[in-house]
């Protein structure tokens, strides 16, 4: 049997676009539609009334701008993401770009504080 942990790791590393493409390929291969399952899951309950507002649990930290201290921001991006110097520099210079995706609220706010302290402008989405 295939190494399931490797499959999980590979799927976790996919970008959103790659995950969407994978879903499309699996739908074609297996002859199913993910849209039907989503529609059933999103259907309101028979109890009526307004559904409770759900608090967002996963955030994307987006570097909106590097600001005046670009070198400091690059250093922080490297420390947060583990990217190499060139990759971190490209990310900072290409702002607005996501620095980290799918992180918990407390971690996202911590990353935001680090980047803002270094001089960057940050958004949480």
From Swiss-Prot:
Any one biological process term the GO annotation gives: translation
InterPro entries for the chain: Ribosomal_bL12, Ribosomal_bL12_C, Ribosomal_bL12_C/ClpS-like, Ribosomal_bL12_oligo, Ribosomal_bL12_oligo_N_sf
Recorded GO molecular functions are: mRNA binding; structural constituent of ribosome
Q: Which GO terms describe its cellular component?
A: cytosolic large ribosomal subunit
Query: CDD domains, from UniProt?
Result: Ribosomal_L7_L12
Keywords in alphabetical order, please. Ribonucleoprotein, Ribosomal protein
Query: Briefly, what is this protein's role?
Result: Forms part of the ribosomal stalk which helps the ribosome interact with GTP-bound translation factors. Is thus essential for accurate translation.
In which family does this protein belong, per the annotation?
Answer: Belongs to the bacterial ribosomal protein bL12 family.
Q: How does it assemble?
A: Homodimer. Part of the ribosomal stalk of the 50S ribosomal subunit. Forms a multimeric L10(L12)X complex, where L10 forms an elongated spine to which 2 to 4 L12 dimers bind in a sequential fashion. Binds GTP-bound translation factors.
Question: What is the protein named?
Answer: Large ribosomal subunit protein bL12
